[in-house]
Every structure is written in C-alpha cells, then in structure tokens.
Amino acid sequence: MTGKDEYYNRAKQEGYRARSAYKLKQLDETAGLFGPGNTVVDLGAAPGGWSQVARERVGEQGTVIAVDLQRIKDIDGVETLRGDMTDDDTRERIIERIGEADVVVSDMAPNMTGEYHLDAARSAHLARMAFETALELLGAGGDLAVKIFEGQDVAPLREDME
C-alpha cells in the first residue's frame, strides 16, 4: 500500500483510473443516475474513472462517450472523443454520433492556481459549460451530474439549472 488515502488505494486495487469513481458510484446508488442501456456522455473524462463506472452501470447495451482535451487511454466499451466540449464542433460531433443522451456527467476541474476564489470561479464556469452542453445533448427526462467547487457562483448556477 501507499501512503495515499483509502479511496486512492482502493481505486488502484479495483482497477479504476481515479478515486473519484467512488463518488460517482455513490451518487448513482442514491440518485439512480444510470440505467441499463443508457447513453452517457462524460465531459472532461480524463483519465476515465467516471467513464469506467458509467460503462459498468449501463451494461453492454449502453453507450458511453468520453470527451476530453487530453488523450484518454482506451477503456473497453467506451468511445473516446478528443476535443474541447466548449467548442461547437465538438458538441456537433457528439450529437452526430449519439443523437441524444440519457445522462451527461462532468468531473471537470480547472487548472488550479491555489487562489480559492479564482479556482472556484473557474470551476463554476466549467460547470456552466457542462450545463449548456447538457441542454443540447439530453433527451426528455435526462440527467446531469456535475462536480463544482463550492463558491459564490454555485447558487446562481443552481438556480439556472432548476
């Protein structure tokens, strides 16, 4: 074992690429985010931990598209798309591939500066971009799960989402 935390060690033992996989599993268990056969788009997917969980949960009949600026190592049953989800071209490529999604997830984080308010504002911007992308991709009754750093921009974003 390493000196890392429990979830880091567990992720490595169980083959997940990131400890955040457990956050998504817990969310799915409490909110019923995924269903068998769902189509899922994972925005800001690298290194792929959330895509791995989505793949497990939707099964072989489901579709998972992982989108990121960075290259994502292949994941069985997951289609990767390298691109910037804030670009219209990337969103159009996703829509051409799947039509509509049942679930959009985003674990995007900004490049950290160490300045809390700036990092929180950048996180909120990425969350808003994920929300706007989800509006284009989600079918009726679709779900969005997005990670965001707590800050002054969370409340206005939450209001817009509701």
Model feature map: region roles:
Residues E29-P36, E56-R57, I98, E136:
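Glycine-rich helix-loop-beta junction characteristic of Rossmann-like nucleotide cofactor-binding loops
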Residues G35-A46:
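Conserved class I S-adenosyl-L-methionine
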Residues N38, G62, G142:
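Glycine-centered, small-residue-biased loops immediately flanking beta-strands
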